[in-house]
Curated annotation (Swiss-Prot):
Task performed by this protein: Part of the Tol-Pal system, which plays a role in outer membrane invagination during cell division and is important for maintaining outer membrane integrity.
Recorded superkingdom: Bacteria
Database matches in Gene3D superfamilies: TolB, C-terminal domain, TolB, N-terminal domain
UniProt-recorded name of the protein: Tol-Pal system protein TolB
Signal peptide region: 1-22
Gene it is expressed from: tolB
This protein's record includes keyword Oxidoreductase: no
Listed Pfam families: PD40, TolB_N
Length: 439
């Protein structure tokens, strides 16, 4: 069966058939595959140094899980950790050299009083014994997972030179119930699926969530009024604004890097075209005017260009146009179907849903070398909606397995893949959020 294109399904409000499911909970995660060439690192247990009131979060296990799923690191299994130093002065480096570890992380958790904890940790290069990092963080028990993600970010950046993206959030849509009584929810969770938060619930489809650059708001499409409308909602307060409810199609909102504009697809003048809306004045600028369907805009990091999906040439392909208007140019030429693009932070790469026959997979186009190089990242047959992590080290996407929707996060080299599943609902429409502020 030929897949009903996502970009057209979005415009008319159709979704894949769903099995009977109940209310949604958080996402569970499991690692699929591994990278044997990844950098070996030992993240040692970090014991709590007090008699009562240990935090529920095992900080070291969260750090290890983050590094593992990045695809860049391979942590030493707990059963192979034969010594457990908690300070750098206690490390016997020949032990870890014999275990073929390149790096080691040690630390401890202390009671900082008044309901807070202090985590102290150190990163060492096993080969020369040099301390690369020595930091401490204090937080309440409820924020210990945030602390662990920030630790993983610091370790990742110190070794790779690239900012980590573990202390980030993802947005996604869940769908549950039967055909006669479907329920949808727009959710936000940590990058590893923990700490889910419901942003909005609806009896009608919710589509195309997109993060504001500061991570405080989400734009999305709702069908609660019968037709499609675009809302922007504050994550912390829940307040929301209806920004587009024109006659016809209102679809695919995408925040500009400045946060003051969105690109969107509207059919107010006939065919769906790409527009830019000023969020203060609500003034519209029409960027495209073709006989085909133009939708799914995505901004370049500098805000000068907008990539979008169009079937103006007969089949869906990716094009780009200046954000102030002008002639659109075609970007993708490989294959008969390229849609739903996400652009990396440095504009050197894009990811798309790429179709061949009845198989749709996530593919990345790398232009950093001056020539176009494609790499297939996913392995399913109905994969869609790719979204880059803010450092472009991983890609989040939606897939169909056994008749239901799941999410995957895959490393940019395609060697490590993690599955994020809800036990009681379909999951789809993922969007990886921006970097979060560290307070």
């Amino acid at each position: 069966m030929t897949k009903f294109p996502r970009w057209l399904a979005m415009l008319v409000g159709l979704l894949f058939p769903l099995s009977a499911l109940t209310q949604q909970q958080g996402l569970t995660i499991d690692i699929v595959g591994g990278n044997t060439a990844a950098t070996p690192i030992a993240v040692l247990p970090m014991p709590y140094h007090d008699s009562v009131g240990a935090p529920a979060t095992d900080v070291s296990s969260v750090v290890a899980a983050d590094l593992n799923r990045s695809g860049q690191f391979r942590t030493l299994p707990l059963g192979q950790i034969i010594e457990r130093p908690t300070h750098g002065s206690e490390i016997r480096f020949p032990t870890w050299q014999a275990l073929k570890q390149d790096y080691i992380v040690v630390g401890r958790v202390l009671d900082a009083r008044q309901g807070t904890y202090r985590v102290e940790y150190e990163l060492f290069d096993v080969r020369n014994g040099k301390r690369m990092l020595g930091l401490a963080m204090t937080a309440r028990a409820s924020a210990m997972r945030d602390v662990a993600h920030q630790m993983a970010d610091a370790i990742y950046e110190k070794i790779t030179g690239l900012r980590g993206a573990f202390f980030t959030r993802i947005a996604y849509v869940t769908a549950s119930g039967s055909h006669g009584a479907m329920r949808y929810a727009l959710m936000v969770a940590d990058s590893d699926g923990y700490n889910p938060q419901t942003i909005v619930r609806s009896a009608e489809p919710l589509l195309s969530p997109d993060w504001s650059p500061d991570g405080k708001k989400l734009a999305y499409v709702s069908f609660e009024k019968g037709g499609s409308s675009i809302y922007i909602q504050d994550i912390a307060t829940g307040s929301r604004e209806l920004v587009s409810s024109f006659r016809g199609i209102n679809a695919a909102p995408s925040f500009a890097p400045d946060g003051h504009r969105i690109a969107l697809s509207l059919s107010r003048s006939g065919n769906p075209e790409i527009y830019v809306m000023d969020l203060v004045s609500k003034q519209l600028i029409q960027l495209t005017n073709s006989f085909g369907i133009d939708t799914e805009p995505a901004w370049s990091s500098d805000g000068k260009f907008i990539y979008f999906t169009s079937d103006r040439g007969g089949r869906p392909q990716i094009y780009k146009v200046a954000s102030v208007g002008g002639t659109a140019t075609r970007v993708t030429f490989q294959g008969n179907y390229n849609a739903t693009t996400s652009v990396s932070y440095d504009d050197k790469k894009i990811v798309v849903a790429q179709g061949s026959g009845n198989v749709y997979r996530i593919a990345m186009m790398d232009q950093s070398s001056g020539s176009t190089v494609w790499n297939t990242l996913s392995t399913g047959s109905l994969d869609e909606s790719p979204s880059f992590a803010p450092n472009a080290s991983m890609v989040l996407y939606a897939a169909r397995e056994g008749g239901r929707g799941v999410l995957y996060a895959v490393s940019a080299d395609a060697r490590v893949r993690q599955r994020l599943v809800s036990v009681d609902s379909d999951v789809r429409e993922p969007a990886w959020g921006p970097y979060r502020s560290v307070h």
